[in-house]
Structures are given as C-alpha cells and as structure tokens.
Amino acid sequence: MHMNFNNKSEILKRANFLLKDGIKNRDSLFHTPIISSLNGNEISSRVMVLRDHIASKRVIRFHSDYRSDKVHELKANKKISVIGYDPNLKTQIRLTGKAKINHKNKSSKKAWEESQAISKKCYSVKDGSSTKTNKPELYDFHMKDISVEDGYKNFCTIEIYYDTLEFLYLQRQGHRRCKFKWNAKGKLQSFWLVP
C-alpha cells in the first residue's frame, strides 16, 4: 500500500486501518499491543488482545478478568497508555486516554456472548489472574469441572477512550512522527513531532 507519509489525514486513516485490522488479524502486531497503567507510583504493563476499535468514538476494547490487578489499578487511576509496533511495517502507534471498566452490564454481556468458548474458560477458573498458586496444573483448560458460563461473573471489558494518537513511521530518507490530539469537545488538533 503506497501512501503519503507527509499527509496527516492519510496518516490518521492508516492508523485507524491498522487498529481495525488488528482486531481480527492475528498476524498483525497491533492485535496484541502493550497496555500500561499505574499501580500507585509504579508503571504496570502487559500485552493484551485488541477486541474492538471504533474510530468515530476514539475507543478501543480489551477483555479482562474482573479480579485482576489491572482492573483494580484502573479503578484507582483511569489513566492508560497503549503502544503497538510492527517492525515489518516500520510503524508504531501510541494512544493515551482513560479506561472504563464494564462489568455485568450490557456492554460486557454483549462481548461475553460474542466470545469463543475457549476464551470464556479463562474466566471460569476458581481464582483470578495473578493469584499465587503452588499447583498451576489446577488451572489447565482440559479440566472437566469448569462451567464455562459461570465465568461471566468474572469477565469484564476495558474500554479505552483515547484523546491522543501518535503515529511513527521509520524510513531511510527520514522518519515521520505525527500526533493527533482531541480536546474535551472532540475537536482535533494535529502536529508533526521530531522523531
């Protein structure tokens, strides 16, 4: 795909395309970006699977166990950062914004119903993510006593409403870095940054 990396509107379209593609394309490195939140004064990062992107609302969605550390962190501080990089495309996308946790509501129910059974099993285990254990085999998915639908009570979605999107493209003749920033009313400002 040939595009003009000197055109900010084309860059924003490209970023939206790569994020949308990352939802279903498991080979895309934007399918599994790094999500960072704050745990007190410490940065806490993890790789998560991108489940949805709605460019018009500037929202991306991930799934999580409601009992996890990241959910507790985001309840205490909604600030969040997302970064993905694909070395083949020489492209980095970074988002910053605020997280919203959906648990036992219409949004989480819809996402749960659209999830595959293998994904649901992750939320059906006895203890939440990051719980210490001496017997990891107790959490293997081949267990016969897991009731998959019981996992819904532990399932939540994390929606990230981003107010900045930064796009970096690496090229031999000169890199391009552009930042898009939306104010509280949704008005877009964009500017070039030195890479």
Model-derived features with residue positions:
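A short mixed-secondary-structure module that forms the rim of ligand-binding clefts
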Residues: R51-K90
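Short acidic, glycine-rich loop/turn motifs
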Residues: S37-G40, G84-N88, Y169-Q171, W182-A184
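A short, aromatic/hydrophobic, helix- or strand-capping loop or linear motif
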Residues: R26-S28, Y85-D86, S124-V125
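Short, surface-exposed beta-edge/turn micro-motifs
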Residues: T32, R58, N77-K79, N154-T157, ...
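An N-terminal domain-cap segment
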Residues: H2-K57, R61, H72
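Short glycine/proline-enriched turns and hinge-like loops at secondary-structure junctions
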Residues: S28, E73-A76, Q171-Q173
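Charged, gly/pro-rich active-site loop segments
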Residues: H2-N6, Q92-P195
